């Protein structure tokens, strides 16, 4: 349906997505599940990393094997909800550097407002993975990607747990070359800009605050 969008439908991911949708799931379990889903998604997001062949000596003989070909990675959570996905990603790619972009959505205009930014100094040399649990209007994601490009970023991927078609279309319109990885594409947005059926406000549920 959508070009450059990858829906990761692994049974474990889909099971855990069902659990975080449940309004009865508390903050502690919600945080753990988001971390687990992010770790599982990282497996697919990094599937296209280049490899190089090396030789290693085993206790028995010399083996020809493969390792990742020196790619530098960066994980960029969009604050605050994106923080919930960082530790899961780092479990699979522990050498990645982590930057932060603080963008919130104005409740009246639904437009993104930037309030914080701290990025790796070598951002132009890294393949970046922008993480945010929800892709609703796409405003925050588009703004974050635009800001990263201004700083010299060349290769960017966007990873969301749940996306609305409106958000996907917005990212495609502004940044058509950026691949989007999601666990679910939902029906759309309600009049308040929330994803339906979604899971509510991911930041509130992660941290137990509104």
Swiss-Prot record:
GO BP term, pick one? uracil salvage
Give, as one word, the top-level EC class: transferase
Superkingdom, according to UniProt?
A: Bacteria
* GO MF term list: GTP binding; magnesium ion binding; uracil phosphoribosyltransferase activity
Q: Which residues bind uracil?
A: 195, 200-202
Q: What is its EC number?
A: 2.4.2.9
Task: Recite the UniProt keywords alphabetically.
Answer: Allosteric enzyme, Glycosyltransferase, GTP-binding, Magnesium, Nucleotide-binding, Transferase
- InterPro entries per the UniProt record, alphabetical: PRibTrfase_dom (IPR000836), PRTase-like (IPR029057), Upp_B (IPR034332), UPRTase/APRTase (IPR050054), Ura_phspho_trans (IPR005765)
Q: How is the cofactor bound?
A: Binds 1 Mg(2+) ion per subunit. The magnesium is bound as Mg-PRPP.
Pathway of action: Pyrimidine metabolism; UMP biosynthesis via salvage pathway; UMP from uracil: step 1/1
Q: Which reaction does it catalyse?
A: UMP + diphosphate = 5-phospho-alpha-D-ribose 1-diphosphate + uracil
List the NCBIfam families. PRK00129.1, upp
Give the similarity note. Belongs to the UPRTase family.
Provide the protein name: Uracil phosphoribosyltransferase
State the organism of origin: Thermoanaerobacter pseudethanolicus (strain ATCC 33223 / 39E)
């Amino acid at each position: 349906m959508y070009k450059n969008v990858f829906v990761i439908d692994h049974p474990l991911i889909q099971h855990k997505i069902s659990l975080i949708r449940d309004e009865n799931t508390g903050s502690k379990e919600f945080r753990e599940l988001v971390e687990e889903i992010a770790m599982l998604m990282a497996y697919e997001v990094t599937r296209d990393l280049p490899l190089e062949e090396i030789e290693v000596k085993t206790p028995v003989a010399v083996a020809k094997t493969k390792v990742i070909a020196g790619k530098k990675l960066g994980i960029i959570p969009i604050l605050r909800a994106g923080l919930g996905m960082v530790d899961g990603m780092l479990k699979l790619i522990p050498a990645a550097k982590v930057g932060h972009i603080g963008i919130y959505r104005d409740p009246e205009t639904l437009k993104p407002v930037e309030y914080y930014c701290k990025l790796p100094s070598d951002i132009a040399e890294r393949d970046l993975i922008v993480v945010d649990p929800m892709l609703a209007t796409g405003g925050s994601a588009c703004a974050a990607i635009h800001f990263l490009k201004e700083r010299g970023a060349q290769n960017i991927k966007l990873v969301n747990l749940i996306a609305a078609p409106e958000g996907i279309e917005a990212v495609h319109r502004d940044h058509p070359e950026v691949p989007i990885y999601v666990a679910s594409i939902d029906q759309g947005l309600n009049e308040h800009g929330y994803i339906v059926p979604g899971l509510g406000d991911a930041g509130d549920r992660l941290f137990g605050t509104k």
